[in-house]
Amino acid sequence: MAPGEAIVSVSYQSTTGVSKQLSLEVTVISPFSLTTDVFNPSIWENGTFDEATRTLVTGQYGFGGWQYTDGLDLSGYKTLTVELGNDNESNVSFRLFDKTSYWTKPATYDFGSSRKVVIELNRMIDENGVKIDPSHLYIIGFWSMGGKPIVIANITLAD
């Protein structure tokens, strides 16, 4: 389900044959919300995040992003596209961890001189060639050398 508005309908019939129906309007949010209550600029080292400009500045060798206590299941999607809104001046990479510790080996995608990375979620591997499981991702975000702004333009999932 894509971010936006949706109507959820619930129907129920009791054992005595009484039927009830309820429709709810819900807001579907992205698992990659760029709000200060969800985005953590200081997963490793002290960073800052400006919600209005979508700008992350990590500490030296820092990491900012999202943490999912129960894991995030992206196995139903084919790709994750991450786009920067400025040039990469601090060796920015996008990393996805399928374990709860930051000190494990993630799938790493370097931006290099590009402003965009496209991640094939079912083909993620770590630096040793070990598969990263998209069905339970615990930490996802941006690593950098630090001290330079990283403008997050867009993060999209596609199936």
Walk through the language-model features, giving the residues of each.
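Beta-rich carbohydrate-recognition modules and glycan-binding surfaces
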Residues: 25-159
